[in-house]
Amino acid sequence: NDLGVVVLGRAASEGVDWEKGDKCDPSEGITNPMQITLKEKAMIKLAKEKCKKVIVIINAVNQMEIQELADDPNIGAILWMGIGANYAPKAVVDIISGATNPSGHLSDIYATSSLSAPAMINYGDYSYTNKDQVIARSKGTGQKYVIEAENIYTGYRYYETRYADYVNNLGNARSNAGSSYTDGNWEYSKEVTYGFGYGLSYTTFSQEIV
């Protein structure tokens, strides 16, 4: 009972996109699939009751909403393992046992709310009004489309760029547009759980530029 390991996961692959409210069981207390379900919360609670230390492993390529885990003082560590095929479990065991030191950094951002990004707001199930004609063409396109109004500002690019604009008071970066909260203006610290490039390790050495 010294250590409890809880694994949270979400399935994903090319061409399999999560939509707002997709595959959500109302009885699980979630409104979008990136949130932690009641069953998962119960599993984490049990681990904390039975074990001295608890580590939560995120086995997903999607960025889940894990602010409550980051705020929980009874969770010793959160480890992202992605979907690493056959060798990933061995690497996780080596990290947990102390055989190797975790030193990776996030390649994308963990937002407090996965629905706050413009790319998510713009996404949807849209079909051309003349889709029957499109399908009839021998070399036609598909019947679905998405207007990517967010341009390059997907993932961390949106949050990091808006933060820079917020600091420099540019545009409407300080407005409540796109905010996950209704108690004030948009704030990076409230919108982001773990920023781009975030990553901790257990090394004891330090480096100094002289």
Give a label for each model feature.
Residues 1-210:
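C-terminal non-catalytic regions of proteins with extracellular/luminal or membrane-system context
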